[in-house]
Regions:
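Conserved core of the sugar-phosphate nucleotidyltransferase
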Residues: 13-101
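Structured catalytic cores of enzymes that bind and process phosphorylated ligands/cofactors
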Residues: 12, 17-18, 22, 29-32, ...
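Short beta-strand-to-loop acidic/aromatic patch adjacent to the donor-nucleotide binding site
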Residues: 1-12
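Alpha-helix N-cap/loop-to-helix initiation residues
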Residues: 8-10, 40-41, 131
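Conserved alpha/beta core of the MobA/IspD/sugar-nucleotide pyrophosphorylase nucleotidyltransferase superfamily
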Residues: 76-149
Length: 149
């Protein structure tokens, strides 16, 4: 049980991006997440999750593959998903009660469970560097980014 209005799950985060995420939830988003421009070389990295959005900012799909397919170079607009989620509490309760879905099992991406179950995910486009900790290599790089004081 919780008396919170929103729940956010993240290990290392830029506070401006967090503020944007919370604003989206306060504006009525059931679930929200953050994306940023994909850096060169990340297209083929399966540990770098990509997201494609509708014109209204809702996620259409997340994948470990390079999406969308870039037919015309220079027009990619590929987005890297930053693994933070904000939930309205009722949405979080619903989400955690759902069984894993076929696409979720295929890609090993839990956010696909939300999309397959009809839960819209608002995607906030943020700028700047985000340092995720998703793999042992990411963890090894952490001290270089945040040295002890």
């Amino acid at each position: 049980q919780t008396t919170a209005d929103f729940v956010v799950d993240r290990n290392v985060l830029d506070l401006d991006a967090l503020s944007c995420l919370v604003r989206a939830l306060k504006a009525g988003a059931a679930m929200a997440t953050i994306a940023t421009a994909l850096a060169s070389g990340e297209e083929a990295d399966p540990n770098c999750v990509k997201v494609v959005c509708a014109v209204n900012g809702d996620a259409l799909y997340f994948s470990r593959s390079a999406i969308p397919f870039v037919r015309n170079p220079g027009h990619s607009g590929m987005l890297k998903h930053i693994g933070i989620y904000g939930f309205a509490v009722d949405t979080l309760r619903r989400f955690t009660s759902l069984e894993p879905t076929p696409l979720e099992r295929t890609e090993s991406l839990e956010q696909l469970r939300a999309l397959e179950s009809g839960i819209p995910i608002k995607v906030i486009i943020a700028h700047g560097a985000f340092h995720e900790i998703n793999t042992p290599t990411d963890l090894e790089r952490l001290p270089a980014r945040w040295p002890a004081s």
